[in-house]
């Protein structure tokens, strides 16, 4: 799973908590650091990942934040999938596992390789 965060001062801490939770359930996470949402989608394709999570307040005021989540390339979670995630979270229906964290910035140089 590709994970990134926006520029707000609190987003990185939220991303770290998200990553810890994902790893504890067996997800392998590739942290691409400070990013724009389109960069996370770009990294999903170029790093061949099945899912993304972007910690961002998007267009909201400072103090608000959320997580844009996507599965399958180019698709974000639909309301039904978000309801399922909410149910899993509120009812603590987590699976246990041991995921791996990788920190990667290779997605940043990929666009320049196509410039002639």
Where are the model-predicted features located?
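Short intrinsically disordered, low-complexity coil segments enriched in acidic
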Residues: 1-6, 107-116
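Ferredoxin-reductase
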Residues: 1-73
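Gly/Ser/Thr-enriched, mixed-charge loops and adjacent short helices
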Residues: 65-108, 114
